[in-house]
Design a protein with these regions (language model features):
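A conserved beta-strand-loop-helix scaffold within acyl/acetyltransferase catalytic domains
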Residues: 66-113
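A structural microfeature
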Residues: 17-18, 96, 167
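Short acidic/polar active-site loop segments enriched in Thr and Asp
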Residues: 105, 141, 164
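Conserved beta-strand-loop-alpha-helix junction that forms the acyl-donor binding cleft
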Residues: 1-7, 145-155, 171-176
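Short amphipathic alpha-helix that is part of the acyltransferase structural core
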Residues: 33-68
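Conserved acetyl-CoA-binding loop-helix of GNAT-fold acetyltransferases
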Residues: 114, 120-137, 156-160
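Acyl-donor-binding surface of acyltransferase catalytic domains
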Residues: 1-39, 172-173
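Conserved active-site tyrosine of GNAT-family acetyltransferases
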Residues: 8-9, 158, 163
Length: 176
């Protein structure tokens, strides 16, 4: 839209936010995925809440956000019937987590994170593929994810496993 209407932003007295995100989608084709003996992808329960909060706090917390905010977010995700909070266990320890929102007409994937020392080893792909395969068996929805454009690694991961760009979201703010 903004490419076709280059004067829109200035005519309305707006400025583009530096942060943009891309929405990607994927069909329902399952992945061929071999089981890895020391890895398990499970729906989380409250017994994993502290490990999940710690991982999400390290990966996603803004400077102004407290651990308590992350704890509340994880607790709500565990209770919400429209939400699935998955964990990736390696030798029984949580090394990854991802949430799926089921409240719309797609399986909306967000918050995928792998612990810092385990990144770059294919665990993010394994977690995403595994939870997608599980959801294909449970419902008839396609998949969607939004990725901050600055998060090049995550964007590359999703494109590598078959997600395709649907649109880019540009946030507009009033000029100060």
């Amino acid at each position: 839209f903004l490419e076709r209407h280059p004067d829109f932003v200035s005519n309305w007295g707006l400025v583009e936010d530096e942060e943009t995100e891309t929405w990607l989608g994927k069909d329902r084709r399952p992945y061929p995925l071999a089981t890895v003996s020391n890895l398990d992808v499970l729906l989380a329960d409250r017994s994993y809440q502290d490990q999940i909060s710690q991982l999400k706090f390290q990966a996603f917390s803004e400077e102004h956000e407290s651990r308590e905010v992350v704890d509340r977010y994880v607790a709500e995700a565990l209770k919400d019937p429209e939400s699935r909070l998955y964990i990736l266990l390696k030798d029984g320890q949580v090394i990854g987590t991802c949430t799926v929102d089921l409240s719309s007409d797609t399986n909306y994937i967000y918050g995928l994170v792998i612990s810092e020392p385990e990144r770059g080893k294919g665990y993010g792909s394994y977690l995403a593929k595994s939870l997608i395969n599980q959801l294909i068996e449970q419902n008839d929805k396609e998949f969607q994810i939004a990725v901050e454009d600055g998060n090049v690694g995550a964007k590359r991961l999703y494109e590598k496993i078959g997600f395709v760009k649907q649109t880019q979201v540009v946030y507009l703010n009033e000029k100060e």
